[in-house]
Each structure stands twice: as structure tokens, then as C-alpha cells.
Amino acid sequence: MIKTVDLKKTFTGRGQTVYAVDGVTAHIKPSEVVVIIGPSGSGKSTYLRCLNGLETLTSGQIIIDGVDLSVKKTDLNLVRREVGMVFQQFNLFPHKSVLENIILAQQVVRKRKREEAEEKARMLLQKVGIPEKEDEYPIRLSGGQQQRVAIARALAMDPKVMLFDEPTSALDPEMVGEVLEVMKQLAREGMTMVVVTHEMGFAREVADRVLFMDQGKLVEEGTPEHFFTSPQEERTKLFLRQVL
């Protein structure tokens, strides 16, 4: 489904070159839930953004559903149609209702008729647990509700894979659970998911594999049971002692 080979992403400034992602090779299979953890600045979010073409890779290879993003002639917009992404910030249109937020991309990108787009939006609002909010505006919603709208909006495009970039980090603690529950349901339904998060409980419970990154490198990976109980690398052990 997703494969990266020796993926590197550099940023240059003040005469220095920084490797935000430094030679990451990984393979994510269909219906697999992969959780990426690591300290701040480890390259987790940059790696995720490379998968959706939001960051241009410096070198290496990204293949999503058979399409090679490292080939310059690749139409990234076609790839993005198949890859949903949910960010830390909800990025909803403040001047549009919840329903309109979910309908817009369906009509513009998927070319769906209004009636079909509305039906899809209402079904997804039911799925994420806020069907009664379709006429509300984002400012009237809690952070957890806004993030659930953002998830519904991404799902409305019928993606083959969902990317989550720290989806709960901007939420008040009591709202984290409602968003994680929606993500757990997606995992149970077989959605291919790559999740950058600090929620270790979610990683233990839902992930098929956990990837640990530090200083742009993939340091260690394994099943949750193996990763959390028998980590092999000293850097992994130190990180887990600090967060668990």
C-alpha cells in the first residue's frame, strides 16, 4: 500500500543542512494500522507530510498504491484523492456550516452531485457521532467535535489510506477520548492508517506496528507487545522510560 525507500528530506538555512527525515525505509500493508512515535523534532510529522506530497522529498522513493511519488511527472492531486489527512489543527472553513465543510471537496474534487454529497456527509456525521451538528458553524463546536468533522471530511473522499498528524494534541484532555474512539472504529473497519501520536495507550491497543523515530531516523519498529515490553535499542528504552 505504502512503501518508502531510503527517504530523505532536508531543510537548509543559515548555512546548515538539517536532515528532518534521514533514510527511512518502511512498508505499510493494506488495512494495517501503523503508529509513529518519537520525541518532538524527530521527523515524524515531516515523514507523514512527505507521504501526502505536502513536503517534497529530497531523495529516495515513495510508492503509494503502486504510484511512485518520486517521479516528477506524477500528478500529486490524483494521489491525494486516495490519501486522507487529518492535522493537529482542524482547518475547517469558519464561514461554512459543518455540512458544507464536508460537502465542498466532494463536489469540487469528486464531482459529486449536491444530493449525493449531502447524503454522504450526513452518513459520516452519524458515523463520527455528531449528526445533530450539521447546521452548526465550527466556532460553535468543541475541539473534539471539530476534529471529528475534520475526520468526516477526509473520509468523504473515500480514501484508501488515512494519515493522522497528532490529531489529539490540540485538544483538551477530556475531548481526546471521543476522537480516539472514532479512530479505533476506523481501524476495526480495516482502514489503512498511519498515525503520528503521543497517545501511548492508543498505540498499544490499536496499532499493528509501532515505529520509533529519532533525529530523522527510524530507530526501531515492532508489534506493540514487542515494542513496549522488549525494546531492543537503548534510545527506544530511554524514550519509553520518559513517557510511560
Regions flagged by a language model, labelled:
Residues D214-Q215, E221, E225-L244:
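C-terminal boundary and immediately downstream tail of ABC-type ATPase nucleotide-binding domains
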Residues M1-P224:
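ABC family nucleotide-binding domain
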